[in-house]
Amino acid sequence: TVKHILSKTNDCELTGVQHGDSQPNAVDLRVKKIFEINKKSPFIISEEGKTHRGSTEVQPDEEGWFNLERGTYEIIMENVVSVGEGYAGFVITRSTLNRNGLFITSGLYDSGYHGVMAGCLHVRVGPAKIKKGTRVGQFLLFEAETLSMYDGSYGIGKQHDNKYGEISGS
């Protein structure tokens, strides 16, 4: 069952929600930062650990526009989410981006996750210009049987998320 995260009937919270962000079944997410993923460094993963490729922050121009060429980027939203027990969530792309050759992929937000909303922005047909603060994704929350709470390497206070700097709502 899909639930609305802004409903008072769940133990979940989403910060940074602005007027107009609440949609009938989801909440719009606004872009805060974009990092270009390093294409030359290998990504290494095993059951023993992982080594990320690394990335470089894309600076918006003086008017707040991110100028993006075709490629894959790590995208950071203005929002921080806390997913309560019995729930999970994921991010989908807003349809306007999808119809223009851009899409966002994101992992599952497990019960117990508290942290930054992030994912990969794939610019399949470039170039693209996205203004900082623009609504680019939507967060969907749903009921999920919880066998244990999230204890991974992402989230507020975790090493990976330190590169994002000060995050409001933490």
Regions found by a protein language model. Give the residues of each.
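DUTPase catalytic domain/fold
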Residues: 1-170
